Amino acid sequence: MSHFSVLVIGENVEQQLAPYHEFECTGTDDQFVQDVDLTVEAKARFDNETETCLKAPDGTLHEFFDEHGNWRPEFSQPDPKAPVHDSGRRTHFIPPGYEKIDVPAAMVTTFAEWTQGWYGMKAVPFGAEPDKAGEHKYGFILLNEAGNVLKAIKRTNPNKKWDWWEFGGRWSGFLKLKPGASGELGRRGLMGSCADDSPGRADIARKGDIDFEGMRNKAGVQAAERWDKVEQATGGLLWTNWESVREAHKGDIDTARNVYHAQSAKVAACKALGDPWGGVDEYLTPRDQYIQQARDSSTVTYALVKDSQWAARGEMGWFGVSRDEVATDDWNRKFNELIDSLPDDTLITVIDCHI
């Protein structure tokens, strides 16, 4: 479960985000929900599944649980390790002469029964229609006249990206307004968390009212100050980055850590930044490049939605960049180019998404 920021370009924010809702959480049964056939997947899983059961002295097989998922009293007992708050918990009991074994699932249950239990979907009797507004809302199993599985259907949105969202949230105040310009603030995140609570910030504003260049300039100045502080502390000496040290000591992570953290220049850099165990390898980047990276990233969110099309780093098809070739710098550069090309009356909205 995580939060991430999304920049929505244009009007009708709710409609633009709608194609990406997680049906299992929103419960919104709309045109974006699809019936996904899981039959082949389910059968392959069932064929390889095993069940733990008891083999009686006469060779018959017995399950620990009944058809409702409850312990069978003859094959269970109070759990002596159960905590006080769960004193009713039970555990396996193996009667004398019985043997606990793993057997193919097909030996103790039918494919229809197993599929209902595994996927949590109820069966639709032969000749009946699924109740998509009720018990079959999130999926169902179609049975033939003999009670065997015809299809196992999961109802979901394959394009799901979020289960809930809000304006601003943890990124409230992300946008810097130009002097005299107006915008709107959404709600802050948990415990009042936000991107920037200083005056002149917004979560919703027109592109022409947003001081994107000011955001970049501030980030660039701060990056230069940090880089110069590290440069002064190390006297211009470099250290070997973590990836290289780890590769040099492959298979011995403790030695790699010790060697990496013992480098005098690395120690000086961490001390200068007031974070003895922090990551400082980014300061091995040349100064001008480091500053440019900071400028570019200052206006960038995790994902972007325009004309109801979702894009994120690694999913940049409509940016004209191969998914396999996308790097952070490429994403940030294309993101900024798009923002700068927008008409000044374009609505810009920052969203806090959760998944």
Regions found by a protein language model. Give the residues of each.
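Acidic (Asp/Glu-rich) sequence patches and key acidic residues
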Residues: 1-337, 341
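Histidine-centered active-site/metal-ligand motif
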Residues: 2-3, 353-355
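A cross-kingdom marker for long, charged
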Residues: 347-350
